[in-house]
Amino acid sequence: MRCSAISPGSGTIINAISTGKGSAFGIDLKIKANVELKNDGKSKINGILLDNPSLKPNLVERCVKNVLEHFEVDYSAKISTSSELPLKSGLSSSSAASNAAVLATFGALGEKIDSELILDLAIKSSFEEQLTITGAYDDATASYFGGITVCNNLERKILKKDVFKEELDVIILMPNFKKNLNVKRMKLISDYVELAFEKCMNADYYKALFLNGILYSSALNFPSYISVDALEAGAVTAGLSGTGPSYIALSYQENTEKVKNAFKKYGTVIISKPDNFGSKIIY
């Protein structure tokens, strides 16, 4: 009983920590999970992160465990993951890993694909591993379905789905900044994040992303001028992704190299595309 699945990461349009409502979009950088099950009655689960074998695979092991417990089977399992996403960077690597792990386990069991249940089990696993504050329903759904999702994270409801109407590149900056999770400061800006969220509900995603980035970078002591540098170089929008430290910019292809050059003085730059396809079983 084997299966492999892939899930893309996501970029932030609105970070949900401040208000409980958020939005994200799929990015074409994926995590692949390979699951092999054995009907031996031992319930032994072993995982490995192939790109970072020294790191503990607790999240993906937890995902497999929760799926097997849900279906009340005592199989043993092996799970391995490989990733195009940098870890702990604000690009939803945890959501992508949990989605891929849960989906691959469903596939290995031969169970019917139930999107709501898959998302619930993936988010449950992230909560149990203390990797999320709000449940990250916006990140999880953008990774699972692809495209743009706008969500009430607290109620686990998708308020709207969309895609970018234009052909865009995603330019990702990974600066050497220390991550900062000051929830109290993020809550202080909730009234202003609400204004950015209204832009998002009105499909003004570029303005929403930029405003959100300025607000959260200020609250978390990341430089906001990096986003302005990207705009100056021709990006249609730019901002902090998640709680950082990564920044994302969206650009038409003719300006991508200029935006990349504006970003690269601050750290490593990756060029990607929006992902509108989401998670899927590949074999």
Swiss-Prot record:
Gene3D superfamilies named in the record: 3.30.230.10, GHMP kinase, C-terminal domain
Taxonomy, superkingdom: Archaea
EC number: 2.7.1.71
Primary subcellular site in the record, as a coarse category: cytoplasm
Single biological process term from Gene Ontology: amino acid biosynthetic process
One GO location term (cellular component): cytoplasm
Keyword Cytoplasm in annotation: yes
Compartment(s) of residence: Cytoplasm
Entry's family note: Belongs to the GHMP kinase family. Archaeal shikimate kinase subfamily.
HAMAP family linked to this entry: Shik_kinase_arch
Record's protein name: Shikimate kinase
Gene that encodes it: aroK
